[in-house]
Amino acid sequence: MIYGCGIDIVSIKRIEDIYEKHGERFLRRVLTDLEMDYCMAQKAFPLNLAGRFAVKEAVIKAFKTGLSGGVTWHDMEVVSSGPPHVALSGRLQEISAGIGMKAISISIAHEKEHAVGLCIIEV
């Protein structure tokens, strides 16, 4: 049974502008070290950064928590070995156990101007 579905779309230019203004401070706020290393190694850095940002927003929406109650950007990590998937930790891991989560699926898509992230949580 589906517990939650979240979707988010972002302007790649907007994310690029935020990065140009705040630099590494922005990256450290929203990405884990592994995600940062992955994005920085890509030729299409802004595209990959925007995709990860969008899917993390989608995960937060699917859990219905927002960034509150102890949930942080670092409670989820987009893992890029094979098809992208999300690893949970901290408060989101606790919430997932509490709701009896059986599966979490994500998808990331991007094109020239936008990136979109989708998350479905099954219980």
Where are these regions (language model features)?
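Core catalytic alpha/beta fold that binds nucleotide/phospho-ligands
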Residues: M1-V123
